[in-house]
UniProtKB/Swiss-Prot annotation:
InterPro entries: Aldolase_TIM (IPR013785), DHquinase_I (IPR001381), Type-I_3-dehydroquinase (IPR050146). Keywords: Amino-acid biosynthesis, Aromatic amino acid biosynthesis, Lyase, Schiff base. It catalyses: 3-dehydroquinate = 3-dehydroshikimate + H2O. This is 3-dehydroquinate dehydratase. Pathway: Metabolic intermediate biosynthesis; chorismate biosynthesis; chorismate from D-erythrose 4-phosphate and phosphoenolpyruvate: step 3/7. The gene is aroD. Homodimer. It comes from Saccharolobus solfataricus (strain ATCC 35092 / DSM 1617 / JCM 11322 / P2).
Length: 220
């Protein structure tokens, strides 16, 4: 079973939400709302009627700056929007660090943690996965390509709904973890938003090609 292909779309002005229609061939489209200033983020409710048409395709992300976000949002605004999204049954990405501070619902949502400057221990990551994986849609773990990072990431693929992201310039590593069991593979819709991201259509093409090879080998 192939992973779900996510096309990450930076929303740099509120009107960029209209671009969603260009990427519906991806399994999921991540709307990176942290590219907006607070004033524009607060206008998101004006677009719910439009977004509702596509919500089964969407991941809404308000990434904290400390975890790779672009613009920091006030916690109060983020809480308000996340609660609205939950009520409207949208899939969103919420950081472990935010859940530790606030009582935000995360059932059937993406719970994430991003490490940039150091490599956590496997035991620490397993603790996070064990805590959130039963209720979450996926627990997403992103780590830098420091010495020993593969030994941290690969054992996590034994879990059913874990997404692992090697923050490496080697794009093939993202494909590899998808083949080995990562629930989601992140790619870009317009421009790379992180190290190693490939264009989403290319990622779809790669996995379709691998699927064709696997299927034909089973037939023969």
């Amino acid at each position: 079973m192939r992973p779900l292909i996510v096309a990450s779309l930076p929303i740099k002005k509120i009107e960029d939400l209209k671009l969603i229609e260009n990427f519906l061939d991806a399994d999921l489209i991540e709307l990176r709302l942290d590219y907006l200033r607070e004033r524009e983020v607060s206008l998101i409710s004006d677009y719910y009627e439009f977004l509702d048409k596509y919500k089964k395709k969407l991941i809404v992300t308000l990434r904290d700056k400390g975890e790779g976000g672009i613009n920091q949002l006030a916690d109060e605004l983020k809480i308000k929007i996340l609660n609205e999204l939950y009520e409207r049954q949208y899939l969103y990405d919420i950081e472990v660090s935010f859940l530790q501070k606030y009582d935000i619902p995360y059932d059937n949502r993406i719970v994430s943690v991003h490490y940039f400057n150091y490599l956590p221990t496997l035991e620490k990551i397993k603790e996070i996965v064990s805590k959130f994986s039963e209720k979450a849609f996926s627990v997403k773990i992103a780590v830098p390509s420091l010495k020993g990072y593969k030994e941290v990431l690969l054992p996590l693929l034994e879990y059913e709904n874990v997404t692992v992201i090697p923050m490496s310039n080697n794009s093939l590593e993202r494909i590899a973890v998808g083949l080995l069991g990562s629930k989601l593979v992140y790619s870009y819709a317009i421009e790379p938003l992180a190290q190693g991201q490939l264009y989403y259509k290319k990622v779809i093409q790669i996995f379709n090609y691998i699927n064709d090879i696997t299927t034909s080998s089973l037939v023969t």
